[in-house]
Amino acid sequence: MAGAKEIKTKIASVQSTQKITKAMEMVATSKMRKTQDRMAASRPYSETIRNVISHVSKASIGYKHPFLVEREVKKIGILVISTDRGMCGGLNVNLFKTTLNQIKNWKEQNISTDLGLIGSKGISFFRSFGFNIKGQLSGLGDTPALEELIGVANTMFDAYRNGEIDAIYIAYNKFVNTMSQKPVVQQLVPLPESKDDHLNERQQTWDYLYEPEPKALLDSLLVRYLESQIYQAVVDNVASEQAARMVAMKAATDNAGNLINDLRLVYNKARQASITNELNEIVAGAAAI
């Protein structure tokens, strides 16, 4: 059994670590709530644009934007959104497994894949697999800005326009609640039909006067909408990261508390044994006299 002094030093070390994990838990909680506010603020914007796109695309008779046209799929581009930092449990690992499984399914259908990567964890992971990486971005921080994402987004959009890829998907961790984050791989381009499109079609009995013409407006709206979808996915992923980190740090704090209690018990036993030995020595010495 270790001496009482060594155990006391160990207790102090674990207490110091516990303070750090508790602080990280509180910081993650605060950041998660702020990110949830950004998520809520951005949703009405993208939903409104989607409704306008639905109406304008029906008004643009004789014109089909490339982002709305299905074509034979031979190669798919996936934009994978991961974190820049660790200590968030299995968040990134679960996303990477889901993405690789989807890539495997496409490969069985003779469909190849190119990647666009956001987040240093994803960059370091997928580089080792030898994928063709169209673009990458890291260092977004906790408050990502849309302007920072446009470069990677346009790289994927240009590849689609030029026929280098036939569809674009986005992989990220969808924030469900504090305790649950779901890795998803969903289609971005061609723009999948929304469930609300048919409802809007039945409800709208009026038409609009478009300035400029519907074609030019649709071109602009589609790019803005897709950029907003990527931004929404990044914000979702940040919220998932902070939630996962909060849970991981809480578990670490609780485990540290349990370890401290165990060490204190061992310390008390060691101290008691030391006192008992000293008493025995005193008694033995007195008996010898």
UniProtKB/Swiss-Prot annotation:
Bridged cysteine pairs (disulfide): none
CDD domains (alphabetical): F1-ATPase_gamma
Pfam family, any one: ATP-synt
A single GO cellular-component term on record: plasma membrane
The entry's keywords: ATP synthesis, Cell inner membrane, Cell membrane, CF(1), Hydrogen ion transport, Ion transport, Membrane, Transport
Membrane topology: Peripheral membrane protein
Single GO BP term: proton motive force-driven plasma membrane ATP synthesis
Source superkingdom: Bacteria
Localization, UniProt: Cell inner membrane
GO MF annotation terms: ATP binding; proton-transporting ATP synthase activity, rotational mechanism
InterPro entries membership: ATP_synth_F1_ATPase_gsu, ATP_synth_F1_gsu, ATP_synth_F1_gsu_CS
Recorded family membership: Belongs to the ATPase gamma chain family.
Stated role: Produces ATP from ADP in the presence of a proton gradient across the membrane. The gamma chain is believed to be important in regulating ATPase activity and the flow of protons through the CF(0) complex.
Assembly, per entry: F-type ATPases have 2 components, CF(1) - the catalytic core - and CF(0) - the membrane proton channel. CF(1) has five subunits: alpha(3), beta(3), gamma(1), delta(1), epsilon(1). CF(0) has three main subunits: a, b and c.
Protein's name according to its UniProt entry: ATP synthase gamma chain
